[in-house]
Amino acid sequence: MNATTANTWNRYYRPILQLGVPIAIGQLGVIIMGFADTMMVGRFSTDALAAASFVNAVFNLFVYMMLGYSYGLTPLISSLVGQGRRAEAGGTLKYGLICNLVFALLLMLILGVGYCFIDRMGQPAEILPLVRPYYLTIGASLLFVALFNALRQFTDGISETSTGMWVILVGNVLNIAGNFVLIYGVGPFPRLGLLGAGVSTLTARIIMAVIMVALLLGRKRYAAYRQGFCQSAVRTASLLYINRQSFPISLQMGMESGAFTVSGIMAGWLGAVDLATYQVMITLGGLGFLLYYSFGSGITIRVAHFYGQNDWSSVRSTTRAGVFILLGMAAISSMIFYFGGEFIIHGFTSDPAVISLSLTLILPMILYQLGDSMQICFANALRGTSHVMAMMWVAFVSYVVVNIPVGYLLAFPCGLGVVGLYLAFSIGLILAASLFAWNFYKVMRIGCIGKRGNGVTG
């Protein structure tokens, strides 16, 4: 390795990997938790698995919107830290917490209205008694999800990505243990089935939020941030600034997740077996998505760091490094799906019909890995430069205008069923990747020197 190559590795590739690996480990814990939930519920009954699929499809839309909203904090914090403005970063956390909690309450209100119309969403009648209590239990956890998300994006923004990793892993262990005890009924605990999975998830999310609050209040190295947090006044202009950075990302992730949510609802129109199959494969496909987003977060942090220093050459080089890293991740995910997919599917369910249909979806799922990894790469690079409005419009065209209608056409008029839904994902994600890349390089050409805001002051 010559000096130039070593410098490129140390300056661009290594930091993304160092930031992304702890996030990836934490996300791997999320994947394992999703696998455990699906496997335990699937072993309990196919109806319970179908009910979980429907509720998770609905809630994933809102959870990803909340996650996207919190993502608006990361580049703001990272940019301020890159300039040594720690007190202002603490103030930005304060505004971000307020915005994220208010946003969560609004989404919970929407979900509460949606609960009144569950029986009109075309789902199999036999799963509705299982859907209702699970829906309410998961809904109660969203405020704690918002609190955890905001605090985690703060620690990620100051390049302490391992903090969120450890808290997520603790939450996963608690959730898996709670699932086993409450789904099947162990010792004095009742056999709650799907509701037990919901209670376990709610409990784990509360504990995760409490741990993050305790860490940020107790660690000495956060003293400067706490001082800025406490001394900053709550100003409407600051809250609106956070919202302008966060809401477009929320809509982008919401529309992306919405394509999967609507597809999940359409899978329910095909029957309980198709819906259960869709849940199995979405859980399996989450392996790639969450890995890509882990390293995508590393790209955002590094891009925002260089953006705060007005170093556009390093912004470009960091993004190029991210492209190669995520392409490698996509190749690894595809090999896991191709060679290990059948083995993993058998772990989710013993229903022969679900297994048979799931096997037909392995290749369509592999097809969309390239588009998924690249749209995440360039979307996160744009996020790092705080040019977030374009993300919203790209998502609207790719997922709402193209993905969902094409999925319907392939699944129903063309008769491809759930396979058609998956093929549509490939089209939507590749289009999104192309448009995000075009917008990023447009920003690079313009340079935007002197036309940005790097934080919120209190």
Can you name each region flagged by the protein language model?
Residues 8-39, 43-44, 57-72, 76, ...:
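N-terminal transmembrane alpha-helices
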Residues 18-37, 137, 171, 204-208, ...:
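Transmembrane helical elements of multi-pass membrane transporters/channels
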Residues 28, 32-50, 118-125, 181-194, ...:
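Helix-terminus/linker motif at the lipid-water interface of multi-pass membrane proteins
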Residues 35-39, 116, 150-154, 177-184, ...:
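Alpha-helical transmembrane segments of multipass membrane proteins
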Residues 46-57, 131, 135, 198, ...:
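Small-residue hotspots at the loop-to-helix junctions and early N-terminal turns
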Residues 49-108, 112, 145-164, 264, ...:
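Small-residue-rich hydrophobic transmembrane alpha-helices
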